[in-house]
Structures are given as C-alpha cells and as structure tokens.
Amino acid sequence: MPKHILIFDSGIGGLSVYKEIKYQLPLAKYIYAFDNAAFPYGELTESVLIERTTHIISKLCSKFPIDIVVIACNTASTVVLPSLREKLDIPVVGVVPAIKPAALVSNKIGLLATPATVKRSYTYDLIKSFAPISDVQLLGSTRLVEMAEEKMIGIDVDITELKEILSPWQNKVDTIVLGCTHFPFLKNEIKKALGNKILLIDSGEAIARRVKQLLNGDEVESAVLFEGEVFCSAPSIKEEALNHTFKELNFSSLQCLGYPKF
C-alpha cells in the first residue's frame, strides 16, 4: 500500500512543491488538487479561504486514504492550517516564505509574494523573528502568479512586463525569497530581468524533507510507480493544455470536483 500524499493549491503553482516531494519520495501515490474556481487565493477573504480549502480537502480525504496533506500555497498556509489540523487526524504541512535561510546569506532581501501574503501580520512576524537586522523589501504581485500559470501551459513570459513589475528592486536586492509556490517556475525569467547574480530561494526542498520526515521515510512496499490523480474545482477552458502539463508529471487526466466560487 503506497503512502498517499495530497498536495493542494489555488492553481498549478503547487507543482513546484510536488516536484521536490516527488524527488524525495518517488514511489508515493500523489493526489494534486487545485481550486481554479476561486483562483487566485490572494483576493479571497480569510473566512472564504478557510471554507473552500476545508471543503475540498475533506472531500478528497474521504475519497482516498490520505496519509499527509501539503498546502502548497503561501497565501492559504498563513490562514487555514489551524482549522485543517483541528479537523483532520493526519499531518498537515504548509509552506512558509524562506526568510530564515535568506537572512543567513544576505541583508539585502526581497520577498516576492502575493499581495495577500505581503499584507499578513504573519509575514512581518517572520521577518522580525528571522531577519531583524536585514533590509527586507516586500513586493506583492498577482500578475506574476498568472504569468507562471501561463508559462506552464506553453505561453511565453513577457520579459519586458516582468522587468516592469520587478523594477522597484533593480540594484536594491541581491537575494529574493520566492514567497509563492508559483514563482519557482519563473526563476530563469527573473534572472533575465534582474541579472544572473540574483540569488533565488524557495521553500520547496525544505517542505519535501519535512514530508519525508513525517512519513518516516516510508513510501510503498513494492517498486511500483503509481500514476497520480489530479482534481480541479471547476471546468477549465485550458483543459487540453493542463492535461498535457500534468501528463508530463505522471498524472492522469484532469477530473472536476464541481465546486463553484459562489
């Protein structure tokens, strides 16, 4: 019986976390779910965010023998973890902006995240705790989330537009914390926009290590490679392109849970 790992995000950016976990635990059974009906999460109220994530995750936990849940969304992680941990009797892991490792290597740090993550008191508490003497500049962008989603279905990133978004940081930061799971997919483009000397840090590898630790390093009793399953909350006009993306990552075709935004 394989270990069942549920990875959840508002979009497909959480696949950056999936890749890191898959590298650590290649023989687990993966279920990926994303709430495209309410994408992007950065624009939801906390109560709606909690209600939606709890509903979708509970539904999938009743459908599969889930061993661990990974909230692969920084915005959701700052809000929903307490309620999910209270409701579920399995480990729930969230993602946290990698402020601590960034502060160990630089004092000119940029935190790139969604507008919601940038505004949360949780984010400021992280900076106060782990980078109290660093110059940490915050930049929130919903458009970057959209650009990452577009790239993953084959649409080229407009470097000129990206440079404009990142222009406040030109020559002002040397280390960027990628505080959204979508942003690792834009690493090459960010370096083109700000220069190759920029150090980019994300929390994907640390999350993967934590998941492996919580599962005691166990995966499956045999060496069978399991095909993952993927669920969305609403039909998508991009279904064909999405299926291509997921197929390359060893997932079956997209399935719809049918959970509209309103």
From Swiss-Prot:
Record EC number:
5.1.1.3
Pathway(s) where this gene product acts: Cell wall biogenesis; peptidoglycan biosynthesis
Q: What class of enzyme is it?
A: isomerase
> Mind telling me which InterPro entries this protein's record contains?
Asp/Glu/hydantoin_racemase (IPR015942), Asp/Glu_race (IPR001920), Asp/Glu_racemase_AS_1 (IPR018187), Asp/Glu_racemase_AS_2 (IPR033134), Glu_race (IPR004391)
Q: Which UniProt keywords apply?
A: Cell shape, Cell wall biogenesis/degradation, Isomerase, Peptidoglycan synthesis
* One annotated GO molecular function: glutamate racemase activity
Query: Active site annotated at which positions?
Result: C73, C180
Q: Which reaction does it catalyse?
A: L-glutamate = D-glutamate
Annotated GO biological process: cell wall organization; peptidoglycan biosynthetic process; regulation of cell shape
User: Which residues are recorded as binding substrate?
Assistant: D9, S10, Y41, G42, N74, T75, T181, H182
Which branch of life, at top level? Bacteria
Q: Transmembrane segments in this chain: where?
A: none
Which family is annotated? Belongs to the aspartate/glutamate racemases family.
HAMAP family, A to Z: Glu_racemase
Function (record text)? Provides the (R)-glutamate required for cell wall biosynthesis.
Q: Report the NCBIfam families cross-referenced here.
A: glut_race (TIGR00067)
Its name, as the record gives it, is Glutamate racemase
**Species in which this protein is naturally found:** Aliivibrio fischeri (strain ATCC 700601 / ES114) (Vibrio fischeri)
List the gene name.
murI
